[in-house]
């Protein structure tokens, strides 16, 4: 898969284009084909114009990048490697809000194919990926981890 990514025969997707996801997507896009996915259409439109909504990156960060910004879930079907970089805010009691990673898991479950890879970059507590995210992905995709996706 690594060589196919470098040869641009396969595509990587980054889910969540905030202050963590966008720089990751842009850095990968300097070498491989990338889909940058965010649920916020206004943010996606800004990034298509080379503007970082968080104002952390300048327009030069978008130059010479092979990236397609989208909020269309169907575009994600072109990817074979997914990186989840959605926020995981905590409340006043330091309890994490898992809704963003759960929704990202639902999104991936709708497009995941046999042999695809999923990486969670989002900061979550130990066991969260296995206990909360993987079951959602498996239920929606109909695939089983390690047998049909990793």
Where do the language-model regions lie?
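Serine/threonine-rich low-complexity intrinsically disordered regions
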Residues: 1-2, 52, 113, 129
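Conserved N-terminal Rossmann-fold NAD(P) cofactor-binding segment
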Residues: 2-11, 33-35, 39-81, 87-95, ...
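Glycine-rich Rossmann-fold phosphate-binding loop(s) that bind the pyrophosphate
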Residues: 17
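N-terminal Rossmann-fold NAD(P) dinucleotide-binding loop
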Residues: 21-22
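Aromatic pocket-lining residues of Rossmann-like dinucleotide-binding sites
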Residues: 27-28
